[in-house]
């Protein structure tokens, strides 16, 4: 149960900031109606699945062969595999969003340091210092301020200060550079577009996985679990009758999981409709548009070189005759 709790926390982190309202409803459906029911109820229902699968024969190996024919993969294992695969796109989205947030913090810190480097120490602490009045005092004050900048914060690091010096350094507010603001806004916009594009892509992949597992469940098990299963598979000598434990309970559980998968598919389609099919097309074609824009910018920045026209020579004129 501890592994499922970790998965629930990761899914909650995936939809905490970037998901829509439909995505949060889908998370509730996945967590409550899938993870909790499979982890708590499913293990109890399918605990004696193979041991209680009894066939009316004493032939060695016949029970195991018929069980493998009746259930190529166990219901509970199929649903666990389905939950893991369906949650994989959301986990990939968590990794991508955390990575982008870390990069954004690094850019923000680098912007602060660039702003501090642009302003000289004289403009921060005054033109002539507080006690020197000349070039020597200015140099001492510059050295003092340069030593005081620690992680982008101005601190008074000198322990042996004179009584005439103030306890705190008077610092004026730094005004960010306009080019830095434009660069920061552009990078933030690109980051938001990238996260939105990746979110749409993971919703598309998640819906495709839901539909694939729904179809696979239908072809493997159908909509009911029979109580009596007839088997003539080797090494059975003749056709034998096998009995499945708790067929009605398993049928109800199977139909319930069909309904949950159908609800998840409908919610995924509703979320895609909410995000907009036009945005989805842009997200799918985002890489091509990005390459095209980079190509146009490069062609615009390159200087146009005029090719000199030497005209036709006599030999070239004769060549066209």
Swiss-Prot record:
Keyword Transmembrane helix: yes
GO CC entries: connexin complex; plasma membrane; synapse
Tissue-specificity statement: Highly expressed in neurons.
Entry-linked InterPro entries: Connexin (IPR000500), Connexin36 (IPR002260), Connexin_CCC (IPR019570), Connexin_CS (IPR017990), Connexin_N (IPR013092), Connexin_N_sf (IPR038359)
Residues on Cytoplasmic side: 1-19, 99-197, 276-321
Gly residues biased stretches: 125-137
Chain ranges on the Extracellular side, renumbered to this chain: 43-75, 221-252
Alphabetically ordered keywords of this record: Cell junction, Cell membrane, Gap junction, Membrane, Transmembrane, Transmembrane helix
Membrane topology, record value: Multi-pass membrane protein
Superkingdom field: Eukaryota
Entry annotated with the keyword Iron: no
Quaternary structure (record): A connexon is composed of a hexamer of connexins.
Annotated function: One gap junction consists of a cluster of closely packed pairs of transmembrane channels, the connexons, through which materials of low MW diffuse from one cell to a neighboring cell.
Record's protein name: Gap junction delta-2 protein
Organism expressing this protein natively: Homo sapiens (Human)
